[in-house]
């Protein structure tokens, strides 16, 4: 086995702000997330409950970036699987700056967690269709019920069965 190492990050947290989506010239989406993870414990000396929150910068690419931009919002709970990456650049004063990010690319994963009601899965056109056609669906259900009742009336189980 080689000793090249493993670079994998798994986080579950909540978004601190709405996703920031941008598109690069080739049309691919890039989305930045600000993800909070919290750790809770009880102080042994005082018995007081403590909490420590870490903020993570997450970068999504491609289709995952588009999905995140469309469905996630501030407060959304999300599962992230990606790689740790540190970038270096120079600021206006020529000083070296560094930022560490979790990059979710082709081999990464993003899953929406939490209450399904907090996500808007249907497109606006689908919502309109549902509103307009709700009565039709209800009518079809009523027809099925009336057919079922009619069939039950036609079948008479009171006849003598010879066996």
Curated annotation (Swiss-Prot):
A motif (Important for interaction with partner proteins) lies at residues 158-163. PROSITE patterns: SSB. One of its GO terms (cellular component) is nucleoid. Residues 6-111 form the SSB domain. InterPro entries: NA-bd_OB-fold, Primosome_PriB/ssb, ssDNA-bd. Keywords: DNA damage, DNA recombination, DNA repair, DNA replication, DNA-binding. One of its GO terms (molecular function) is single-stranded DNA binding. GO terms for biological process: DNA recombination; DNA repair; DNA replication. Homotetramer. Plays an important role in DNA replication, recombination and repair. Binds to ssDNA and to an array of partner proteins to recruit them to their sites of action during DNA metabolism. This is Single-stranded DNA-binding protein. It comes from Wigglesworthia glossinidia brevipalpis.
